[in-house]
Curated annotation (Swiss-Prot):
Residues 42-74 form the ShKT domain. The lineage of its organism: Eukaryota, Metazoa, Cnidaria, Anthozoa, Hexacorallia. GO terms for molecular function: potassium channel regulator activity; toxin activity. This is Kappa-stichotoxin-Hmg1a. InterPro entries: ShKT_dom. The keyword Secreted applies. Residues 1-22 form the signal peptide. The keyword DNA damage does not apply. It is found in: Secreted; Nematocyst. It comes from Heteractis magnifica. Changing residue 63 to Q: No change on KcsA potassium channel blocking activity, and 3-fold decrease in Kv1.3/KCNA3 potassium channel blocking activity. Residues 23-39 form a propeptide.
């Protein structure tokens, strides 16, 4: 019984490692596709009044699809 418990814990740990590795691989692929638009830390605010598609495209902090949700919130 104890050996089955140990085997189950090891199996769960292995599965979690596989999932984490797969997520990291997907993030690397996404970063390569986006080129210079890799994830970066937010260093300054874009005021909500200036949150436009053009401003978001040229911003280091936001991806276009997230801009409307995050402008002015850093």
């Amino acid at each position: 019984m104890k050996s089955q418990m140990i085997a189950a814990v090891l199996l769960i740990a292995f599965c979690l490692c596989v999932v984490v590795t797969a997520r990291m691989e997907l993030q690397d692929v996404e970063d390569m596709e986006n080129g210079f638009q890799k994830r970066r830390t937010c260093k300054d605010l874009i005021p909500v009044s200036e949150c436009t598609d053009i401003r978001c495209r040229t911003s280091m902090k936001y991806r276009l699809n997230l801009c409307r949700k995050t402008c002015g919130s850093c």
